[in-house]
Regions:
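Basic, flexible linker segments flanking DNA-binding modules
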Residues: 1-38, 42, 109, 119-126, ...
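C-terminal domain-tail junction helix/linker
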Residues: 22-27, 36, 129-133, 154-213
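An active-site-proximal beta-strand-loop segment
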Residues: 35-73
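Short, solvent-exposed loop/turn segments at secondary-structure boundaries
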Residues: 51, 76-77, 113-118
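Active-site beta-loop-alpha junctions of metal-dependent nucleic acid enzymes
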Residues: 57-58, 74-102
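Short small-residue beta-strand/loop micro-motif enriched in glycine and branched aliphatics
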Residues: 70-75, 136-138, 162
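Acidic/histidine-rich, metal-coordinating catalytic segments
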Residues: 80, 98-116, 139-141, 146, ...
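RNase H-like polynucleotidyl transferase catalytic core
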Residues: 104-107, 124-147, 165-166
Length: 213
């Protein structure tokens, strides 16, 4: 009886182990200089703001925010796709006005491919690599890890989309552009009552003085 029981224990069915994807430990990094870390995300433009024929199209706002200076770049697009986010990343450095060392995104399909389904890189991932930008991904279901861009989107909802309506696509783009400029030139408590543009200007002015001395 004991031998048979031992054989049974040895040969009985065992449930296969499930391989789970591991994620790197989250390390908070607020940025020590402009471009060290930039958070990127996308939000939809509320339908109630659109007062012109959109013919079934939805509008989205792609946002990049520099952790050090809080400078932002906004872009309105018609689809939530790697095609649009890749176009955005290609012009990001020229629009920000400085080199970007790393960018952080969530795990949305408009940015990255699901590593559990394919080993291929998305167009966005390839583009980031070609510009020598380190790509960091937040952990799943952890929007707080991209907290600065998430909070800025909430402010956009209150200040821009909660107060205005747009009678044409041209007007939408114009108002978003004005909103971006106003944000980047407005003094903020977190920046010791300086604007994002002032923070960037002061940083590179100090760098130039160090090089000259």
């Amino acid at each position: 009886m004991g031998v048979c029981a031992g054989k049974y224990e040895k040969n009985r069915y065992r449930k296969p182990a499930i391989s789970r994807k591991s994620y790197t430990k989250y390390i908070r990094m607020d940025g020590r200089f402009p471009g060290e870390k930039v958070q990127v995300d996308i939000k939809y433009v509320p339908d109630e703001c659109i007062r012109f024929p959109s013919y079934g199209c939805r509008y989205y706002q792609i946002t990049a925010i520099d952790e050090y200076s809080r400078k932002r770049t906004l872009e309105i697009v018609k689809e939530k796709s790697t095609y649009e986010t890749t176009k955005f990343i290609k012009q990001l450095e020229s629009r920000m006005g400085f080199r970007i060392k790393s960018i952080q995104v969530d795990n949305g399909a408009e940015f990255v491919n699901d590593g559990d389904r394919t080993s291929k890189e998305s167009a966005f991932e390839k583009s980031s690599k070609s510009f020598e930008m380190q790509l960091r991904r937040t952990r799943p279901y952890s929007p707080w890890q991209n907290g600065k861009v998430e909070r800025s989107h909430r402010e956009d909802g209150k200040i821009l989309y909660g107060r205005k309506v747009f009678t044409s696509e041209k007007e939408l783009r114009k108002q978003v552009s004005k909103h971006e400029a106003r944000y980047n030139n407005t003094a903020k408590t977190v920046l010791n009552f300086r604007s994002p543009n002032e923070i960037v200007e002061e940083y590179f002015l100090k760098c130039n003085k160090c090089l000259d001395s």
